Amino acid sequence: MLRIFKFLKDLLLFIPLTFIFLPFSRLFIFLTYFNKLLKWIYTSRKDFLYCDYFSPIRKYEKRFMLYDFVLGHFKLEDLQINYLEFGVGTGTSFKWWSEHNRNQNSQFYGFDTFEGLPEDWGGFYSKGDMSSDIPKLDDDRTLFIKGLFQDTLTKFLHENSKILSSNTTKLIHMDADLYSATAFTLSQLYPFLKKGDIILFDEFNVALHEFKAYLEFTENFYIKLKPIAAVNNFYQTAFMVE
């Protein structure tokens, strides 16, 4: 049986009959990961402590309900944390977390190109969309790192390895939108993750981007992320490292 399989595979490499499916490749990939997302939702939704599924209409302000739940559940108001946000944009979420955490020893790091998306996203947004100025916050605990994550994160992690390897809880906010940026960032952060760290995804249910990156990260690194809270039909989703 194995010989037959190998023969057929090699034959298809020589006679590329599968090219007839090439125009539908993107659709097949989307359906594959969308079904993976559906399966994940139906098997994991019961594990969430807070979840609004199913909501017929998404509401932007629901993300703050998610933040508020995470803040209260983990008692983060006065806890020292290291907050890392990937995809700052105008800084709305970044500002929310810096304002709601009162510990003066906390540190807040925001990563973004501030020049918009580095590539097209989701069929609706083009390269360069969502550009913004670097936010100006009156808080000396905050620092913004401008540039592609692929260019800035490795150096940052090397220079701050002691801080990130400490027992201080890390709150990681993934708002990069793109698969490429999310997958890269999670892989680089893996050595620094410890039990109790929190990871938020801002576009989790986008099947070919943040969800795909999450799925590959948990499978490839054998890491367990405990579901905590979700709003807007899992568009914004929070996990804790187990």
Per-segment meaning from a language model:
Residues 1-57:
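Membrane-proximal basic amphipathic "stem/tether" segments
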Residues 4-11, 15-19, 71, 75, ...:
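HDAC/HDAC-like amidohydrolase catalytic core signature
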Residues 40, 47-53, 69, 76-242:
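S-adenosylmethionine/decaboxylated-SAM
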Residues 54-66:
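Conserved SAM-binding loop and adjacent beta-strand
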